[in-house]
Each structure stands twice: as structure tokens, then as C-alpha cells.
């Protein structure tokens, strides 16, 4: 993957850093976005999702450093004290997932992000994968909206929650379905994670 690193230097000398994956997020940070942010108070532009992930991340980083406060305090309440180091792979037969995870564990990774897809038997896959990885190793199941709606996603995820190594449901249904995601959040014990760009980030953290 190609990464774009963004560095913001404030008038007080504080430096904020962010990153973009140009072919995975919504593209590179443009010169126009840099011009819009340049010379502005960072807190006045850091909520502008159109700036691009790397620049927006760098602005949050700079504001947090200037206030001597962690970025989570700018977003809301603290929800975790650490983050897993994740290994990523696409949807594939469970035998291949097991091989991927064996290599991930060998290299020191602590979680496995993969694609939950309806053309595989997810319950069988998650059961066999859970048995194959150590107790500290967690699973992040990314549906990319393939759960379709709460009526389908809720019972499936509830059945999969019996496997305690499942740590995250990522985009189980369309992220724009705010009420549907609220319903899932109310009935599922495993947290739901979303990409930060849709719906608007302010909508995500408020609702």
C-alpha cells in the first residue's frame, strides 16, 4: 500500500502528523485542501471531512498537542486504553484464514481484520478460526454493508457473538443507515466500528 504522510506546523511550533492511504481512503490530500487550511486556526477546520484523512488527522493531532490533551478528549469520552496491532486479509476459505493468522501471531500481531462475506459459512469459519488462534488474539469482522439491514445482521451477529474472540463488527450494514446502526448497537454486545467519512463524523459521534 502507498501511504501519504501529512505534517502540520502551527504558529506556536507544535507539529501534528497524519496519514492517508490514497487508494483506500478518499484520495490524496489536494493542494486546494492545503490552501484552505493554511493560515486558519486548526480547531476551525479540523472537522472539515473534505480536507482528506491525513490532513484532518494532523490537525486533530496538533490541536491535542497544543492543549496537552489526548485526541479522544476532543471527540468524546474515552473508550479504550490501547489499540491492537492488526493483520489484514480478504475473504477466503477458513483454511487460508488459519494460515494467515498463524503467520500474524508469529510476527506479533494481536488481531485479525478480515472480510465477512455471505458466500461463506461465517459461523463455521469463525468457530474454526477461534479454535485455531491463541486466547489473546482477536477477530475484526468487516461486513462492508453485507449484513444488509438490522433484520438480517442482528441475528447473525448475535449468533457469532458466542465466539468471544470476535472484538469488532465493522460496517455490518450501510453506514448511512443511522437508525439501523443505533438499533444494532442497542442489541449487540460486540462494538460496531465505522469508516470515519460516512455519515459525517459529527453525526457518528453524536448519534
Describe the predicted segments one by one.
Residues 1-7:
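Short, Gly/Pro- and small/polar-rich lid/capping loops
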Residues 7-69:
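Metal- or metallocofactor-binding catalytic centers and their adjacent structured scaffolds
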Residues 16-18, 83-89, 110-114, 137-143, ...:
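Hydrophobic faces of well-ordered beta-strands that scaffold small-molecule active sites
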Residues 67-91, 134:
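N-terminal small/glycine-rich loop or linker at the start of catalytic domains
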Residues 69-75, 94-102, 127:
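Short, charged beta->alpha transition segments
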Residues 80-113, 120:
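Active-site-proximal, glycine-rich beta->alpha crossover segments in alpha/beta enzymes
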Residues 120-207:
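Catalytic core of soluble alpha/beta enzymes
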